[in-house]
Amino acid sequence: MASRPNILFVLVDQLGARWLPTYGFTLVRAPQLNRFAGESTVFERAITTSPVCTPYRGCLLSGRYPSQTGLLRNGQSYPADHKSLADYLNEAGYETHYVGKWHLSGAPQENRWVPPEKRAGFQHFVGWESHHVDHHAGLIWRDDPHEAIEMPGHETDALTDIAMRQLALAAADANPFFMLLSYQAPHPPCSPPRAFLQQYESRDLLAEPNIDPAAWFRHEDWKANYGVQRFRELYFGEISHLDAAFGRLLRRLDQLDLRENTLVIFTSDHGEMAGAHGLFGKGVMYEEALHVPLIARAPGQSRGRRTRQLAATIDLLPTMLDFAEGESDGMAEGMSLRSQIDGGAPKGERVAISEYQNFCATTQRWKLITRGRTLEPAALYNRVDDPCELRNRLHDPACMTPRRTLSKALQRWREHAVAPNRNESEHQWQQVKI
């Protein structure tokens, strides 16, 4: 392996590990991801640092918590005074490419051009700000706001085609490349091609004990059209379609003779409740929203392995800089996961912190959720004995030790990460559109 590999980072939107066969959910068909996992390192427990799009993306690019970047909700812009992963890799001699959904320019949540000064340092940018209605009829831009590129057919297919062309351009450059490919799928509203939808119609998709078939919907206009069963048919079909596109992308990587010197990482910004606990969407601290897939194939790796190393969003920037032999400005949090990707043992017990409308502290076994953005505990779950999080152990006398331990961890984190002069009431947490 060359010392400085290319890096292909594939980010999908609203795909929880809970819904993938790689993580034990056999109702969904994802053969390409299964094949990729079989030759990669699968992190069994990866936790998003924020279960919402913009805060997550700010964390990914900065290596810092939302409370440190100020990106606490959707519709905010990546701060100009924060260096990004692209900046660090540019300094390390990489060509940096971004393809797909951005959601970091502060513009309204719609399909629009992203100006160069809002691109967080990426040298080559082919993307758009936010949503395309039902994954069809989308537009994507390079540098001219008046020259939009139409994405015919389904957005996932068109975006994959664009990414494969961009890969060929990147491969021709003398410098190593970093490409962040950001899919919007399987973010609802879902409209998978018929062939993928048919795989799930007329099948019972309501197997979990924490499901609520009459679940409350965040989006009022979905109520008339979806029940949990129908939502899952569409959502799972979107996952299978995305899986097929990911397989095409990997085959193109092989055709370009890039496999032996390219680190490939597949992950998601957050999960999807899909009717669990009577909820849809994200923005909460249940496992369906927090637990994301994280699968990494090191350059030249061909044998799969699984690691119990607890991973978090803030680990991704230091991991990629470790492979690239790059340096940050010392402000990034997290730890490099390179040792585990290369087959090393887990580094031991740690606490992963997540934040949005609540704070949450997670270990391999326990999860503590606060009441709003305070340190008042609201729920404590034993993830090993109660994987569907049906029994709140907060007031169980036998669970006082993990409650105290995680409460102290949150207190230390808050003192370190949350700016004391920030007026958080201005964010109106219950009104945020996610």
Language model feature labels by segment:
Residues M1-G372, E376-A378, P387-I434:
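Formylglycine-dependent sulfatase
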Residues V384:
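Residues forming the ATP-binding cleft of Hanks-type serine/threonine protein kinase domains
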